[in-house]
């Protein structure tokens, strides 16, 4: 299941984007999570740890998409980010935070879905070889061939890998483990 997170402070625009993504459910297993506030998104991202694609509105009242992206990059420097906005004036800023693409509103379904599907294809290839889990510093990602073994004691998971030993709270079945 791919997790796509959207953040736009306009409920109407959020509904349009979610509607476009609903079309993907016929082809791919996607979970769509939406936020109307960047601060709420950051709070949940710190707790839950990851998503496969992040779609951010550039201009939001509480915290703009670029600010949200900067904070996300401190937690996860690999998550693909799509920026959507009504103006192209800040396109360069979007690319400074490593945005994959910049899409101008009103968002055309075909353009948006094309970008999302390209990212999902990339993520699917990555998933075959990466194990990710939440950590204090954000999301930790390890190559599966670097993992020696996993241990579970109630809800505490211990990962012993080439890079070191890591622990997180959860269950192995809820994580994307091995292909």
Task: Please tell me what each predicted stretch does.
Residues 8-10, 86:
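Acidic di-acidic motifs
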């Amino acid at each position: 299941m791919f997790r796509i997170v959207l953040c736009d402070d306009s409920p109407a625009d959020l509904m349009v984007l979610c509607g476009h993504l609903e079309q993907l459910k016929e082809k791919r297993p996607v979970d769509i999570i939406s936020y109307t506030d960047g601060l709420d998104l950051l709070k949940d991202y710190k707790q839950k740890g990851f998503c496969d694609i992040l779609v951010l509105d550039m201009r939001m009242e509480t915290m703009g998409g670029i600010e949200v992206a900067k904070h996300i990059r401190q937690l996860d420097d690999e998550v693909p980010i799509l920026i959507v906005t009504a103006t192209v004036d800040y396109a360069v800023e979007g690319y400074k935070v490593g945005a994959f693409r910049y899409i101008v509103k009103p968002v055309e379904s075909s353009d948006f879905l094309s970008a999302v599907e390209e990212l999902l294809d990339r993520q699917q290839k990555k998933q075959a070889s990466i194990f990710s889990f939440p950590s204090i510093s954000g999301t930790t990602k390890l190559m599966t061939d670097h993992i020696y073994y996993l241990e579970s004691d109630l809800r505490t998971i211990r990962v012993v890998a080439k890079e070191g030993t890591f622990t997180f709270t959860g269950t192995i079945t809820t994580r994307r483990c091995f292909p």
